[in-house]
Amino acid sequence: MKFPAFITAIISIASLSSAISVSGAAEGFAKGVTGGGSATPVYPSTISELVSYLKDSQPRVVVLTKTFDFRGSEGTTTGTGCAPWGTASNCQLAINKDNWCTNYQPNAPSASVSYDNAGVLGITITSDKTLIGQGSSGVIKGKGIRIVSGAKNVIIQNIAITDINPKYVWGGDAITLNNCDMVWIDHVTTARIGRQHLVLGTSASNRVTVSNSYFNGVSDYSATCNGYHYWGIYFAGSNDMVTLKGNYIYHMSGRSPKVQSNTLLHAVNNYWYDISGHAFEIGAGGYVLAEGNVFQNVPTILEEDDGQLFTSPNSNTNQVCSTYLGHVCQVNGFGSSGTFSSADTGFLVNFQGKNVASASAYTVAQSSVPSNAGQGKL
């Protein structure tokens, strides 16, 4: 039986609407986030529609069904930057953003740079938004996303953000949070990024959960000139509580994560694999509890610790967690990796009364995270 075209279209739209919804719910500090809630899903077809939906003042569920390629949409800039990390073909170059080369790398060789303007600043996402991909189809290429300027109640799920000026430091970040609250990033893949895969800026990002995501550091260019991306994850907020759970952090050479300023980080059941430099870098004001994680082929798990760190070192010491987190902390697992042992407990009281993610044994993360993290793995 053949249906009239308009009936077929109605059925197709209804099927899409019913099929697209947020999977699961945020654990940890962003528990209770609803994003666009029950708003009727919208399906942008152009980059301008996508930008418009994400920045308007209405609650929205924005569904990506294809690749939105921003490269070339805002022109290119050619100028003089610098080569602080070397002049080999696989070394990243730096854009002279805000005279960074001039002021901070005066002895670095000058270098010609030509970068895509769209990548430098991400798409602004305002309050009460859900950005979700359909299947493995939702990709934003050449531009990141920004949840800033007081935005609250945002969900990002099941998308990929890729190819943001990967040759150039200051070429753009994949995900930026700054001055926001109640943000859940889930099943997101990032790859081939110029600067940070994920950055929480110096203003408070408050309550954030990052879960089941895949931070892929494989790149033709890197600051360490070896194909391992250095600028991974940077938490620098003035009043941040971050749950980092079930993520796959792969092929990085540093800052994975860097934690400082006034950030309380619960790193639980993540999998770090093939990190050529260091994973954690903890500056002053960084408070990190790490439990149930896997470190495989990570020679230097901790480069610097000027904050406070509890690594859940053994079953006896881990009993203290039950008072503050409501469960006994899980030991971490290690394979061909360096040491990671610290038992600062003074900051654990900061977890008391908060929404704290559950923790499984590291063997659960070992078997499940690589195959379940990232876009298309809901």
Curated annotation (Swiss-Prot):
Function: Pectinolytic enzymes consist of four classes of enzymes: pectin lyase, polygalacturonase, pectin methylesterase and rhamnogalacturonase. Among pectinolytic enzymes, pectin lyase is the most important in depolymerization of pectin, since it cleaves internal glycosidic bonds of highly methylated pectins.
GO biological process, one term: pectin catabolic process
Keywords in alphabetical order: Carbohydrate metabolism, Cell wall biogenesis/degradation, Disulfide bond, Lyase, Polysaccharide degradation, Secreted, Signal
Keyword match Metal-binding: no
Full protein name: Probable pectin lyase A
Residue numbers annotated as active site: R255
SS bond partners: C82-C101, C91-C225, C321-C329
EC number: 4.2.2.10
Compartment(s) of residence: Secreted
Signal peptide: 1-19
First-tier enzyme category under EC: lyase
